[in-house]
């Protein structure tokens, strides 16, 4: 399944707020909610499916990518669900987003693809690049990219940057301090349901 490129508002109306996908908030009429949920028993499969879809759309990844992350998380020591979230959160495109350098993850991915981002002084054009503690994230010395990021930073710095990241406005430099903990996830998600969804595939 390819990466979603359709209307974003339609997705958040169904799944709820997904800040990585869009900074818009879902607005549902109470009547539509009642019509869709009244007298209907939601199956456990649907609940798990929707939690899985939240991860897919929020982080902007394909079905195959998410399944691969689940498989990696299963092989690692510790809580599979928490490790899965850590893997997704440490993606370069997500780190750029969480630093406030872009308003969405698709915007961050575009910066990476266009070779505007450096990690430890080297250009990295792979959005899925897995960041590590002590990695420095900077931008190329180009007026256009600096102007875009500076504008975003001024607006999004009012939102709290998670504790595992630090951003220096003076140096225009982001730092990965450590692997994040569960409390720093910027998404309302039950990751255990996602793991259960893939229990027969991973």
Curated annotation (Swiss-Prot):
GO terms for biological process, alphabetical: ribosomal small subunit biogenesis; translation
Q: Does the entry annotate any disulfide bonds, and if so which pairs? A: none
Q: Which UniProt keywords apply?
A: Chloroplast, Plastid, Ribonucleoprotein, Ribosomal protein, RNA-binding, rRNA-binding
Question: Domain named S4 RNA-binding: which ranges?
Answer: 90-153
Where is it localised? Plastid, Chloroplast
Grouped into one coarse class, the protein's main location is plastid
Q: Do you know which CDD domains this protein is assigned to? A: S4
| Single GO cellular component term | small ribosomal subunit
**SUPFAM superfamilies from the xrefs?**
Alpha-L RNA-binding motif
Xref: Pfam families:
Ribosomal_S4, S4
Q: Look up keyword Coiled coil and say if it applies.
A: no
Statement: the UniProt record of this protein carries the keyword Transit peptide: no
- Its Gene Ontology molecular function terms? rRNA binding; structural constituent of ribosome
Q: What does this protein do?
A: One of the primary rRNA binding proteins, it binds directly to 16S rRNA where it nucleates assembly of the body of the 30S subunit.
Similarity comment text for this entry? Belongs to the universal ribosomal protein uS4 family.
Which PANTHER family does the record cross-reference, listed alphabetically?
30S 40S RIBOSOMAL PROTEIN, SMALL RIBOSOMAL SUBUNIT PROTEIN US4M
Self-association state and partner proteins as the record states: Part of the 30S ribosomal subunit. Contacts protein S5. The interaction surface between S4 and S5 is involved in control of translational fidelity.
- Its name, as the record gives it, is Small ribosomal subunit protein uS4c
